């Protein structure tokens, strides 16, 4: 029984990919706690070596932000690029759609997610970033397309 609970917790808290913070800029001064900022992060597609995505999103500061209780705005931008060789023969076996990145955007209920689609006809990887909540999400989204191989 303990193993079942542990496995459930691991699945619940599993993260498809880890992002590396590239940098940030402050956009709103806060008297107490860190300033609100726009963060630029990079993560590699875990299933497609040679593709890296860069994502920018706002991070709320202040006292709530300092202790992890703030809710970040549900807006993000993404740009994915081929940064190395991609084995095009393996792309037809990819799950599509497939979540490749997820990050908490509030204490419990809100996440920013990146989902990858494989457009077989056009030989392109499409990455969609959006924010959702347990009850309702946001229609704000951004996509990036990485053309792969010969047609």
Feature-to-residue mapping (PLM):
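N-terminal signal peptide c-region/cleavage motif recognized by signal peptidases
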Residues: 14-16
């Amino acid at each position: 029984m303990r193993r079942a609970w542990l496995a459930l917790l691991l699945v619940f808290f599993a993260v498809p990919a880890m992002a590396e913070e590239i940098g940030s800029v402050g956009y709103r001064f806060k008297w107490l706690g860190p300033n609100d900022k726009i963060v630029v992060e990079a993560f590699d597609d875990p299933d497609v070596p040679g593709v890296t995505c860069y994502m920018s999103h706002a991070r709320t500061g202040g006292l709530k932000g300092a202790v992890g209780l703030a809710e970040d705005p549900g807006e993000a931008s993404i740009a994915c690029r081929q940064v190395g060789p991609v084995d095009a023969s393996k792309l037809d076996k990819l799950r599509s759609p497939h979540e490749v990145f997820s990050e908490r955007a509030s204490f419990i209920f809100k996440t920013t997610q990146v989902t990858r689609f494989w457009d077989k006809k056009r030989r392109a990887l499409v990455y969609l970033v959006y924010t959702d909540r347990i009850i309702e999400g946001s229609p704000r989204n951004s996509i990036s397309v990485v053309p792969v191989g010969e047609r």
